[in-house]
Each structure stands twice: as C-alpha cells, then as structure tokens.
C-alpha cells in the first residue's frame, strides 16, 4: 500500500506506477534508511511519541531487518513497494504490527531520503578513498621498480624531453592525491544532518536535531529546513570529484594504450587485462584500458544530467530530485571499478627498457640541453633557441642525432660549441640537470617515491 493513498479515490495506473516507483534503484539505500529510522525512533521517543518499550521493540525489529538484508540487499527487488522507505515501513509493520505505523510521525520522505542519500555518499567517499590509495600504492610500486627506465616525454604527442617511467607513474600518483583530497573536502561538507527538517518547514516536534545528527554519525543538524530537503550538493560534489578523477584515469589509460601499441612498444600489458580478436589471432587488445577511457563518459554524463535537472527547480523538494539516484549509483560503481582495474593493469606490467631508451634517444629530445649549453656560454636563450633549431634541421637532413655531429659541424652554427658539448647531450645529463623540486632528476624521483610511501603509510 502506498504511504500517501488516503487522498486518492483511484489507484495509480500501472504504467505510471512503474514510471514513478524507485525501489528498483533506491534499494541501495536500504541500510541507510534502516539506520536513519533507528535514529528517528530514538528522537521521537525523547519527545514522548513512543514509550521506551515501543522504542526498544522498533529498534529490535529494525536491527533484525538490517541483519536479514545486509548479506544481499538485492533481495529487496523481489518486492513491489514504491520506494525503499515504503519497503522498510511495510516490513517493519509485518514484524511489529501497528506500532510500525508510528515511526513516521514527524518525518517526511523528503528529509528521510535526504539523510539516506547523505549517509550513502559518506560511505562512498570512504570506500573510494580506499580504492584511490590502492591504485596509488601500485603506481609507487611500479615507479620504484622502473626508476632506470628512460623514455621520451611528450608534448603534442611528439617526443619532447627524456623522462623516466617512474616519473610518469608519479605524475598519476599526484593526480590521484588531488582526487583523494577532494573527497576529504567533500566529506567535511557531508557532516550536517537533514533529518528532522520535515517536508520543508521543519518537524512539529521539539526533538534535539543536533543529538539526532550525532546518533547518525553527523556533526550537527542542518540550519535551514528548506535548504535541507532541497540540497543535493553532496551528490554533485561526489559526481564532480568522480568526473575529475575519471579524466585522470582516462589519460592514464590512454597513455598505456599508446605505450602498449606496436608503434611504441614501450611496455606490454598482462594477458590478465587484455583480450583477443574473434578474427585476427595475433591480436592482444588493451581492453581494460580502453574501457576505463570509455567509461569516463558515463560519469561525465551523470554530472551533466544532475546539474541540468537541479538548475531550474524551485524550493523545496520536487520529484525531479528522484533523478539524482541512478546517475550517482552508476557513477560511483563505475569510478570504483575503474580504480580497481587501473591497479590490476599495473600488477604485471612489463616495461621494455631497451625500447624506451632507444625511443628517448630519437626525436632530438636533447635539443633543449644544447640550448642550455649555449646559454651557459653567454648566449641569450632566445638566440640559443634559434641556433639549436637550425642545428636540428641540419641533423634531420643528415638523418643523424645531434650527438653524432662533429665539432666542426656544430661550429657552423656557433663558434662557442666545443668538445665539452657531447657529455651535455647524453640522456643521463638530460635527466641529471632537471634537479629542481619536481624534476625528472633520478634523485628527485627517488625522493618523490619515498615521500609518497610515507604519505601512504607504506
């Protein structure tokens, strides 16, 4: 039976019922709905709505219900209730009879779903931080194992300057650290409890909302009932953080796809995260990475969809807000899966250090070193830049790297160039010179790895 049937003389059309009902997706809020109900039972007992005996009877029944569904909350889907609130109430009534009908006193589904969603989002933030940390651990482990793997760094997908695979790994560690921080910040703003705000104007019972908030794991009750039942900022913040993180994961995946390609051959992905072709027996496709890259669109879409849904809503609650759920549920599952698969991809990755070094020696990625060499000889950088550009054109015409040019050839471009230029042009010199904080100098990279291990508690 619907929770609101008294006003209506006709039953809802079956098509509308399916269109309106949300149990098929909001069943995921079952544990939060039960926990919120336990907290609410205590709150209304404090103002005399329930006796202490009734309170205890309800709490026992709610805890029993929680224990029954916790191993597999999907069993709820066998039911035909309108939503998770209706389902919990109906099951409670089955257990305690008419006493179960007293629980909703002073409460609206508007503040009920608001607190359910906020509690669910808090749980998700913690779980996702754990998944981020796991991927960061894998990145640090991979970096530590590949500190000597010199490879080309790219701008515009063209070889630019030499880096190491370890430095590449640590770049993604830093991106994920910002994602972790964003979740921490978002979690702080989830510490206000909307329960007790009623439908929009507040509850008619003088409950202690701050005590209720603390019972439910919040810091304090919200300050404005209109805002409380209308607020979905916590959902938007999770979706926003997920979207930014999925940008990072998509770029991570794209890099690995490129490095794994036959054109690069910098590394090989494990058989555990690749698949074959139904037609071409030689293929080994980077499907795990391609799916991470592809699934980013689902998460972006959830954020865009909810922003669009909320932007024109008047205060307070509107049924449009039911559309916050499917997007966030799917986005959080997708983000979590991508973080887990990203870590799996790194487990058995095999970097071809000979090939990465060979590639780093190509493409004139030491040209900047030659320009810096000229600057050290007293030539203004802009002039040095032009001189080196001409030298590169000459080397390209000879199909030789810069370091293969003779001193006499170098002197065609400027007389200050001498024998001391050759050590400067080596890959090792290119790396060593980048010794400022954050640079690719091997010692700086080692320091970054050690700092990350301390941060991760490794």
UniProtKB/Swiss-Prot annotation:
A single Gene Ontology MF term assigned here is: argininosuccinate lyase activity
Top-rank taxon of the source lineage equals Bacteria
> One Gene Ontology cellular component annotation?
cytosol
* Compartment(s) of residence: Cytoplasm
Q: Please name the pathway.
A: Amino-acid biosynthesis; L-arginine biosynthesis; L-arginine from L-ornithine and carbamoyl phosphate: step 3/3
**Catalysed reactions, semicolon-separated:** 2-(N(omega)-L-arginino)succinate = fumarate + L-arginine
Name of the gene: argH
The EC designation for this entry is 4.3.2.1
Q: What is this protein called?
A: Argininosuccinate lyase
Which family does the UniProt entry place this protein in?
A: Belongs to the lyase 1 family. Argininosuccinate lyase subfamily.
Biological process terms from the Gene Ontology for this record are:
arginine biosynthetic process via ornithine; L-arginine biosynthetic process
For the keyword Lyase, the answer is yes
Enzyme category, top tier: lyase
The UniProt transmembrane annotation reads none
Cited CDD domains? Argininosuccinate_lyase
Which keywords does the record carry?
Amino-acid biosynthesis, Arginine biosynthesis, Cytoplasm, Lyase
């Amino acid at each position: 039976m619907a929770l609101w049937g008294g006003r209506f003389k006709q039953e809802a059309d079956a098509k509308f019922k399916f269109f309106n009902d949300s149990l098929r997706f909001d069943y995921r809020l079952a544990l939060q709905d039960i926990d919120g109900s336990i907290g609410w039972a205590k709150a209304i007992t404090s103002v005399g709505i329930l006796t202490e005996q009734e309170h205890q009877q309800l709490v026992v029944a709610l805890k029993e219900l929680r224990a029954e569904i916790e191993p597999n909350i999907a069993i709820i889907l066998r039911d035909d209730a309108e939503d998770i609130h209706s389902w919990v109430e109906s099951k409670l009534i089955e257990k305690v009879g008419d006493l179960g009908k007293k629980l909703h006193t002073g409460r609206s589904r508007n503040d009920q779903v608001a607190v359910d969603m906020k509690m669910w989002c808090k749980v998700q933030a913690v779980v996702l931080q754990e998944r981020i940390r796991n991927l960061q651990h894998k990145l640090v482990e991979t970096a530590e194992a590949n500190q000597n793997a010199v490879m080309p760094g790219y701008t515009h997908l063209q070889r630019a300057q030499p880096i190491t695979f370890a430095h590449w790994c640590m770049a993604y560690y830093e991106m994920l650290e910002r994602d972790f921080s964003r979740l921490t910040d978002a979690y702080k703003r989830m510490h206000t409890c909307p329960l007790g705000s009623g439908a929009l104007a507040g509850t008619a019972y003088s409950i202690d909302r701050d005590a209720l908030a603390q019972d439910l794991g919040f810091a304090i009750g919200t300050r404005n009932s209109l805002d409380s039942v209308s607020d979905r900022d916590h959902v938007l913040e999770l979706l926003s953080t997920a979207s930014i993180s999925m940008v990072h994961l998509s770029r991570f995946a794209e890099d690995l796809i490129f490095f794994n390609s036959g054109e690069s051959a910098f590394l090989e992905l494990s058989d555990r995260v690749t698949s074959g072709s139904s037609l071409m027996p030689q293929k080994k496709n980077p499907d795990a990475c391609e799916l991470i890259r592809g699934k980013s669109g689902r998460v972006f879409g959830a954020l865009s969809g909810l922003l669009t849904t909320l932007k024109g809503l008047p205060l307070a609650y509107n049924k449009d807000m039911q559309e916050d759920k499917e997007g966030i549920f799917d986005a959080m599952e997708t983000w979590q899966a991508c973080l887990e698969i990203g870590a799996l991809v790194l487990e058995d990755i095999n970097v071809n250090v000979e090939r990465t070094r060979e590639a780093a020696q190509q493409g004139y990625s030491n040209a900047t070193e030659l320009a810096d060499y000229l600057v050290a000889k007293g030539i203004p950088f802009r002039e040095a830049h032009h001189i080196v550009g001409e030298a590169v054109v000459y080397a390209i015409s000879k199909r030789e790297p810069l370091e293969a040019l003779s001193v006499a050839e170098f002197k065609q471009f400027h007389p200050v160039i001498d024998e001391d230029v050759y050590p400067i042009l080596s890959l090792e010199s290119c790396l060593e010179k980048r010794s400022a904080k954050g640079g690719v100098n091997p010692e700086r990279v080692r320091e970054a790895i050690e700092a990350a291990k301390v941060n991760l508690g490794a």
